[in-house]
Amino acid sequence: FKQKTAYEISLGLVGSEMCIRDSPSIQPIKNNDLTRIASGFGMRTDPFDKSRKMHKGMDFSAPRNTPVYAASNGIIVRADSRSTGYGKHIRIDHGYGFVTLYAHLNSYNVKRGQTVKKGDIIGFVGNTGRSKGLHLHYEVIKDGRSVNPVNYFYGNLTPEEFDEVLRISVQENQSLD
């Protein structure tokens, strides 16, 4: 996959400028040096039972309370502190079948029903729920199915940076959740 392919995916959303504007298109944490990706989408080793399982998102390692940003415009459909595998987590509905999930947060500053804009700070990195270390678990869900988030990072990466993120994200490793 190249950034051109990700761009073509975004063009496949054509039919509505709003659809493109509101689809997730940026990384959910600052990753200027591209060193934050701890685990990518796909089959990974579970850190708890060491079995191979589908990892439905990407893990970004970061210090506690690193800001987490909304990947696009949307409405908060869940801001939950219940004790689940995701720990403290947020779900944003972006419309057009897109939902993003931000998990294992230390805290969040949004509530259900709130409208957010791309780049708004919505929470802070933590280690809650079924987690083996400080990180953000990030998922992109399209029409009810988890898809590889890296394909939606076309909004804030150069083609060279995109290639590097893609290279890092496909490496076989252990997820943090």
Report the location of each language-model feature.
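Generic preference for well-ordered secondary structure
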Residues: K2-Q3, R21, R44, I76
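Short, solvent-exposed mixed-charge patches
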Residues: L176-D177
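Long amphipathic alpha-helical scaffold segments
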Residues: S16-E17, R21-K30
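Short, flexible, glycine/charge-rich loop motifs used to bind or transfer phosphoryl groups or to couple energy/partner
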Residues: Y7-I9, S25-I26, A79-D80
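Short hydrophobic/aromatic segments of transmembrane alpha-helices and their interfaces
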Residues: F1-K2, G119
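Intrinsically disordered, low-complexity regions enriched for glutamine and histidine
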Residues: F1, C19, G133-H135
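Short, small-residue-biased leader/transition segments that mark boundaries at the very start
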Residues: Q3-I20
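Catalytic cores of peptidoglycan-degrading enzymes
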Residues: I29-E172
